[in-house]
Design a protein with these regions (language model features):
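Auxiliary alpha/beta "docking" domains used to position bulky ligands
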Residues: 1-192, 240, 357-379
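Iron-sulfur cluster-binding cysteine motifs and their immediate structural context
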Residues: 23, 198-222, 228, 242-266
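Flavin-dependent oxidoreductase catalytic cores
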Residues: 188-198, 208-211, 299
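Alpha-helical adaptor scaffolds
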Residues: 270-304, 311
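Alpha-helix N-cap/helix-start positions at coil->helix boundaries
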Residues: 260, 300-305, 334-339
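Short, charged low-complexity linear segments at domain edges
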Residues: 163-188, 216-235, 286-290
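Amphipathic alpha-helical scaffolding segments comprising HEAT/armadillo-like alpha-solenoid repeats
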Residues: 289-292, 319-331, 351-361
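Structural detector for internal amphipathic alpha-helices that build alpha-solenoid repeat scaffolds
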Residues: 307-318, 339-348
Length: 379
C-alpha cells in the first residue's frame, strides 16, 4: 500500500479518477442534511409521495446518510450524462400513434452501471488510505441524493426539483459514495432559475404544485412507473402518448440547451423502444416484454402495467378502427387492464362519433415548438 496522501491531494485525485471512470463531474460534501428534514417531513405530511410507502417508512433516515454507513464523514457525489443521440423528443411527442418513453429508460438500466463504477472509485481510494470504509448508492437506498449533489456543487435544485447544471442541463444520473475520511468539501453553486417558471406551467398534469415541490400523485412518471393500481380517470387524457415516464419539465427548461450527449454505449436506445408504434407495443406477449426489457429499467413495472399505460395512450390517440380492434383483442386478461381498455374504447368511440381527427393538447404543441427551436439536435 502506498503512503497516505494529503487529503487535499486525495480529493483532487478522486475527482480525476471519477472522470476517468466515466463520470462527468465529482463533488464532495459532508453528511449534514438537517436543513432538508423539515421540507421532507412537510412533503410526506401532505401525502405527496402517493403510494410510495417506503418513502414514509424510511422517514428522516433519508436525510441522515451517516446512519446508513456508521462512521461516514463525507459523501462523494457524481453525475453521468444519459441523453442519447437522436433523442427524437418532438417527433415522438407530436405523433400520437407512437409511444413516448422517458429518455433515461431507453437503454440499459443505469443502476448497475453507476454502482459498479462507484465501487471501482471506492477501491481506488482504498489503495491510497491506511483504512477506508465505503458504500456506493445509486437511487437504491433511503438517501436524499439531490440535496447532497447540490451541497457538493454539482448544480442547483430547479423548480421541478431536479438538479440543474449550467454546462449540462439536467439529463444526467446521480450517484453517491459514502466514505469515512474527512476530505475537504466543495461549495454549492449559485442557483440560476431566477423568475423562470417554465417547468411549472408546462407540466401536463400540474404536478409541480409550487416551486421545488412535486405532488407525485399527479406526476406522469409516478403514474406510469410507481402507481400499481388504476390511473385516475381525470389525469388520463393529460398523459397523451407518454407510456413510461415524462421529460416535459426538462425539455422546456432553457438550461437544457446545454445538455451533453452520453458517452456510454449502454445508454443508447434499444430499437424496439425508440419511437415505437403503440399498437405494436400493445400486442407484446409477456414473454416478448420480458425479452425486450431484459436489463432495462422498464422491466420492473411488469407486463400488466406496461399494457395499462399503453391502453391509456391508445385512448388518447385520434380515432382509428385498428386501435379499437387492438383494444378489443386484449379484453378479459386482467380486471385492471379491462378497466383502462374500457375507458380507451369509450374515448375512441367518442372521437369517431364527433369526427375528431386530431386531439389538441395546447401544452404539448407549445412544448414541441420549443424543442424544435431550442433543441434542434434532439428534436
Amino acid at each position: 500500500m502506498s503512503e497516505p496522501l494529503d487529503l487535499n491531494q486525495l480529493a483532487q485525485k478522486i475527482k480525476q479518477w471519477g472522470l476517468e471512470l466515466g463520470f462527468q463531474q465529482v463533488g464532495i460534501t459532508d453528511t449534514d442534511l438537517s436543513a432538508s428534514e423539515p421540507k421532507l417531513q412537510a412533503w410526506l405530511d401532505k401525502q405527496y409521495h402517493g403510494e410510495m410507502d417506503w418513502m414514509a417508512r424510511h422517514g428522516m433516515l433519508r436525510a441522515r446518510p451517516h446512519e446508513l454507513l456508521p462512521g461516514t464523514l463525507r459523501v462523494i457525489s457524481v453525475r453521468m450524462n444519459y441523453l442519447p443521440a437522436n433523442a427524437a423528443f418532438a417527433s415522438t411527442l407530436k405523433t400520437p400513434k407512437l409511444g413516448y418513453v422517458s429518455r433515461y429508460a431507453l437503454g440499459r438500466d443505469y443502476h448497475k452501471l453507476l454502482r459498479n463504477r462507484l465501487k471501482k472509485l471506492g477501491e481506488m481510494i482504498q489503495q491510497h488510505c491506511v483504512s477506508l470504509n465505503f458504500r456506493p448508492f445509486v437511487d437504491s437506498a433511503p438517501i436524499l441524493e439531490r440535496p447532497l449533489a447540490e451541497k457538493a456543487g454539482l448544480g442547483w435544485t430547479g423548480k421541478h426539483s431536479l438538479i440543474l447544471n449550467r454546462e449540462a442541463g439536467s439529463f444526467f444520473f446521480l450517484g453517491e459514495l459514502l466514505v469515512d475520511i474527512p476530505l475537504p468539501v466543495d461549495q454549492p453553486v449559485e442557483e440560476g432559475c431566477g423568475k423562470c417558471v417554465a417547468c411549472m406551467t408546462i407540466c401536463p398534469t400540474g404536478a409541480i404544485v409550487e416551486p421545488y415541490t412535486v405532488d407525485a400523485r399527479r406526476c406522469i412518471s409516478y403514474l406510469t412507473i410507481e402507481l400499481e393500481g388504476a390511473i385516475p380517470v381525470e389525469l388520463r387524457p393529460l398523459m397523451g402518448n407518454r407510456i413510461y415516464g415524462c421529460d416535459d419539465c426538462q425539455l422546456i427548461c432553457p438550461w437544457n440547451r446545454y445538455s451533453q450527449l452520453t458517452t456510454e454505449d449502454d445508454f443508447s436506445p434499444r430499437k424496439p423502444l425508440h419511437a415505437p408504434e403503440l399498437i405494436e407495443l400493445f400486442a407484446w406477449s409477456e414473454e416478448k416484454f420480458l425479452k425486450v426489457t431484459e436489463g432495462s429499467a422498464i422491466r420492473r413495472i411488469g407486463h400488466l402495467r406496461w399494457l395499462r399505460n399503453i391502453a391509456v395512450a391508445l385512448g388518447n390517440a385520434p380515432w382509428d378502427e385498428t386501435i379499437l380492434a387492438a383494444l378489443e383483442s386484449r379484453k378479459g386478461e386482467h380486471p385492471l387492464l379491462d378497466e383502462h381498455i374500457a375507458w380507451a374504447i369509450a374515448q375512441q368511440i367518442e372521437r369517431r362519433n364527433a369526427s375528431i381527427v386530431e386531439v389538441q393538447l395546447p401544452k404539448k404543441q407549445r412544448l414541441v415548438r420549443v424543442i424544435e427551436k431550442g433543441l434542434p439536435r434532439d428534436a
